[in-house]
Amino acid sequence: MAEIYRLRNKFKHYEWGSQTLIPEFLGVENKKSVPYAEMWMGNNKGAPSQVCLKGDRDSGVLEDLIKISGELPFLFKLLAVEKPLSIQAHPNMEQARTGFKKEEESMLSMSAPTRNYKDDNHKPEIFCALSPVTLMAGFKESEKILESFNELLNVLPLLYEILEPALGMLKTGTLSQFFRMLFNISRLEQEYLCSFIREIDEEEIERTSHIISAAQWELIKKFARLYPSDPAILSPFYLNCVNLMPQQAVYIPAGVLHAYLSGFGLEVMANSDNVLRGGLTPKHVDIGELMNVLQFVPFIPEIITPPDGASSFCYNTPCREFLLFYVSGTQTFKKEGPAICIVIEGELKTGSLIFKKGDSFFIAKGGAAVSFEGNYALYAACPGE
């Protein structure tokens, strides 16, 4: 049987994270009451995992094992979203190589807040829900975008002069021209727009709103409260809103604008930390570079749903860097390593090792397929085919 090693992982305490979801899932106390946004599982240089080599006390660097057992071309994350993440997109391979080379040649520090490219890799990703999750992903059809904005103007006609230049581009130009014009709104106009949206009358919404759902209005008002001078508060009008139930997943290719808004889940991506942000964040926003990587075409994300009662399931994607598996019961994990697994329910035994909810482990390459015993459920990430 392949060698298996318990993992010790590092956390990202971004302000959008939850103080409770990850600590409770792992069974640890959050003594400092800090937000736990992400737990990284893998060998990305931004937060590389360690492995327990003998029992639980001695540890080594996962990268050293990977050199022996084969490449680990993906990064596996646990995400806990209390506040909305930025609207963002990730580059394709060519864009990542070009952007990384440019920033390296400019001698821009890797830790600089204006750094966009931390590496030269693309970053397609899949997000799988562990709780109900809300996100936005992909541009709507131009006609649908116009319908949404026209309904906004029915509720708030005073915004017509601010929004008409961008909407005019959508009618006679392209989606990219609309997007650029929307983000060229002056700061004063942005603040004016946000103030009106914050104070919008609920009865007026009920009377005039038929296309925009109550949940979308709540999102927009929430964005206006959190980011009172940000044109990205209007993103629910031009991006698809998606709701996931536990075990459901969406695949987000490079170049697709998206934002995770709330919930708890797992994310697998190509081993990269390249992010281009467009708003809804105090972090660095680079609209010009974001537009360079965006695919300005409508994109409706497909929700991947396992069959009811499935004890194992593969979340297929076109990405060769990773596959995501769900395994439960007494199933044999038939993929060869390397792989990273995280237990989400119950307890399992494999060989002399016991893993409980919240535990993660690395399966090295080589040896026979791994069998798990017990009453458990886990997710496993491994290289694609």
Q: Can you name each region flagged by the protein language model?
A:
Residues L79-P84, Q88-E94, D119-K123, A129-L135, ...:
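Ligand-binding loop in jelly-roll beta-barrel domains
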Residues M1-S209, P282-I300, L324:
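Transition-metal
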Residues Q50-L72, G138-F139, L226-M245, K334-E336, ...:
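A short beta-strand-loop-beta hairpin characteristic of the jelly-roll/cupin
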Residues G263-C314:
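C-terminal, non-catalytic macromolecule-binding modules
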Residues V34-Y36, E71-L72, E82, N121-K123, ...:
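A short beta-loop-beta micro-motif enriched in histidine and acidic residues
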Residues M181-P246:
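A charged, amphipathic alpha-helical module
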Residues N240-Y260, G366:
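Conserved SET/PR-domain catalytic core that frames the SAM/AdoMet-binding pocket
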Residues D308-S311, R320-E336, I354, K365:
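Conserved short histidine dyad/triad with adjacent acidic residue
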